[in-house]
C-alpha cells in the first residue's frame, strides 16, 4: 500500500503538470515519446534475437597514429645507418630523427673528421619518457651485441637497481654526508642516453623532448650557429597583484647591469695593459651594484686579470675580499633560487686557478697554505657537507699546485695534441718547472685516501698522465718511466697505444733529454721480448690514427736523427721516419 501510494502521488503530480501545458505540445510530445518507445522496443527485440558474437560493435573509431617521418640518408652512407634508422623508428617508436653527416662539415669545425676520428654519423632521436628511452637503449645494446658481436659504449643509461659495489661505496660515505655533486639539478636519469655503436662511426643520442630542447645538440653538429640568448620567464605569484611584472623588471635590470660589467671586462682583456689597469678598475667599480651573483663573479674575474698584469692596482687580499662580500651580502641572501653549494665549489675552483696563474710569485707550499685557509673559511657558509674530492678538476688543480714555472707553457696532453695538429714541432721547450717532491707525495696520498681508497680503484688515466709529465719535466725519470709503463699496460686498444707512443716521442723531443730518448729508442722501440712500438705498429696494420699523427712522428724522428746522427739508435729512428 505504501508503494502504491507513492506511485499514485507521483502520477498525480505528473498529471497536474501536464494539465497546465497547451494541448498541442502535450499531444506532440506524447506522440514522439510513444514513437521512440516503439522504435526502442523494436530495436531491443531485434538485438535480443541476434547472438552477442554476431552483433555489430558500436565503438568509437580508432585514431590512426601518425607515421614517423624518416629523414633522408646522406649520400654514400653505409647500410648499417639504414638499419639503425629503421630500428629506431619502426621497432622502438622514437620520433623526430635527425641525421648529421660529419664529413660535410668544414675542416675548422670542432666535430669535423679532421678534428676527430671517432664519429662519422650522428643520429638524434626523441623518446616519449625516461622509461621509453631506457627501454630503447637496452634493446639497442642487445641488438648490437647479437648482430655485430661486440658491446657498444653507452653513457647516461641508469636503472633503479643498485649493485653490490655501489652499496658498499654508499655505506662508506654515510658519515661524510652527500657529496656536492650528488644533486641531479632536476634532470632525470635517462633523459639523455648516448650510444657509441662502434660501427661505421655511428653515434646515437636518445633524448627526451625537454632535454633535447635545452641541450640543442643540433647546433653542435651543424654548420649554422645561431647566437640567440634565451631567458626563462620569471614565475608569477597568483596571490600578489603585478608581482610578475615587478619581478621581471628587477631581473631585467640585473641582466642589463651584468652585461655592462661584462663589456668592461671584455674590453680590458682585449685592450688592457699595465698603465690602463687603474682606469678599467675605476670604471668597473662605478658600475658595480652587487645585486646579483653574476656581478660578483665578473668582479672576481676582472680583479684577477688586473692582478696578474699589475699587482699594484689589485692585491691578493682584495681578490679574496670579493668572495667574502658575496657570501655576506644581505641582498643575495634574500634572493631565492641560489645554490650556494654550487657557488662554493665554483669559487674554490676559480681560486685554485688564480693560484696557478700566480706562477713563481709564491712557492708551492705558500699556495697550498693559502688554499687551505680559503677552503676553511668558505666552508663556513655551507649548510651541507661538501666533498671536493669528488670533483675531478679539484684533484687536477691540487696536483698542479705542487709545482711552479716561470711560464704557464708546461707540456701537457693539450699541448702535445696541438703539436700533432701542426704535424710536429722540432723546437725544444725552454720552460723548466720547480717541483716540490714532498708536497707531490702528500697530495698523491691525499687523493688516494679520499677518492681512490678502494683496492680496486686506481688513479684515472688522465691524472696519471698529468703526473707522468710532471715527473719528466722535473727530471725525475725513474718515476716517469714507472708511470709510463703502467699507463701503456693499461691501454687495451692498439690505436690508443699507437697514439701514446707518438705523444711520448713528442714529449721527450720537447724536453730534449738525450738519456730519456736513448732509453726509449733502445729499450722500447723494437724490443722483441717485451712491449715495443714496432709490435704495436705491426698489430695495427702499419697504420696511424690520422695523417697528422703520422707526419708529426715522421718530422720529430727526422729531427732526432739529425741532432744525434752519431748514435745508432738515432739513425735507426731516422730510417724508420724515411719509410713513413
Curated annotation (Swiss-Prot):
For this entry, the transit peptide stretch runs 1-38
A Pfam family (short name) is RsfS
Keywords carried by this UniProt record: Membrane, Mitochondrion, Mitochondrion inner membrane, Transit peptide
Question: What is the membrane topology here?
Answer: Peripheral membrane protein
Q: Which residues form a coiled coil?
A: none
Q: Fetch the InterPro entries from UniProt.
A: Atp25 (IPR040152), NT_sf (IPR043519)
The listed locations are: Mitochondrion inner membrane
For whether the record's keyword set contains Mitochondrion, the answer is: yes
Entry's Gene Ontology BP terms: mitochondrial gene expression; mRNA stabilization
Q: Its GO CC terms?
A: mitochondrial inner membrane
- What family, per the record? Belongs to the ATP25 family.
What exactly does this protein do? Probable mitochondrial mRNA stabilization factor.
Name used for this protein in its record: ATPase synthesis protein 25, mitochondrial
The species is Candida dubliniensis (strain CD36 / ATCC MYA-646 / CBS 7987 / NCPF 3949 / NRRL Y-17841)
Query: What gene is this protein a product of?
Result: ATP25
